[in-house]
């Protein structure tokens, strides 16, 4: 069988979107599109990573990201193993380095890590021989979420990112999702706007490649997409928020706001949602919503990431070759 030659994947790890060139980004997205097609078939499992092992090391609570990686690994026929902080020696005072070295002794091919400390994924990547995927480190980065968001927007926009406008709405200060999306989408020529209470904007935000708004009615004018962020309710207890009812009145995205956006504007949310606080239920379930598309994109994109890291292949993967590169 003939195989089409493709560029080899040069990275051992995926730690941040900033490490990817434009060509590498679109190679990853093209690979995700192939897996997205496979995921729509009656039989979704392929033997591509049979014999490979993936450890899901989540030292922070997670449902969506962890499940998405687990499904992605299993659909590639990899063996996946989950480790939560409560079930690891970290909860007994063991250092991250010692836990990581213990995991490496088990010879996994990939470790997917989520940790409350910024830089935790890079710390592991510099010390371990296996590949490391950053599934969220503190407030620093969430590269796989930004990649799946980019994939979801590409399904609507095609490759025409230049000149588009995206509004990110909500708790920017504590959002690694916002940081990764700002870096990735602005690098593609997307004009990024932020809208949040002043207390929920991060220090140094004026150095970001963004335009900042305090009023949602102004921020949403003419945008091509709105990304709502989860409002972390513990911030309200810390005095960073006004009354929640007041917040919803000022910053909850509604169908009225979407009438001010571009005619084909779409809505995204990384989840979990607080309906009626960050986004109205009507809009979350509307045809303009890409929220469920993001979930499907998450599995396909993470399949692509695991595949590229585990094989670093230069051979195009096709469904008809049984998943063998």
UniProtKB/Swiss-Prot annotation:
Pathway where it operates: Pyrimidine metabolism; UMP biosynthesis via de novo pathway; (S)-dihydroorotate from bicarbonate: step 2/3
Q: Name one GO biological process term.
A: 'de novo' UMP biosynthetic process
Catalytic reaction list: carbamoyl phosphate + L-aspartate = N-carbamoyl-L-aspartate + phosphate + H(+)
Q: Which keywords label this protein?
A: Pyrimidine biosynthesis, Transferase
Q: Where does L-aspartate bind?
A: 92, 176, 230
GO CC annotations, alphabetized: cytosol
Annotated carbamoyl phosphate binding sites: 64-65, 114, 142, 145, 271-272
Q: Which residues form a coiled coil?
A: none
Q: What is its EC number?
A: 2.1.3.2
The source's domain of life comes to Bacteria
Q: Which Pfam families match?
A: OTCace (PF00185), OTCace_N (PF02729)
Alphabetical list of PANTHER family matching this protein = ASPARTATE CARBAMOYLTRANSFERASE, ORNITHINE CARBAMOYLTRANSFERASE, MITOCHONDRIAL
Q: Which family does it belong to?
A: Belongs to the aspartate/ornithine carbamoyltransferase superfamily. ATCase family.
Q: What is this protein called?
A: Aspartate carbamoyltransferase catalytic subunit
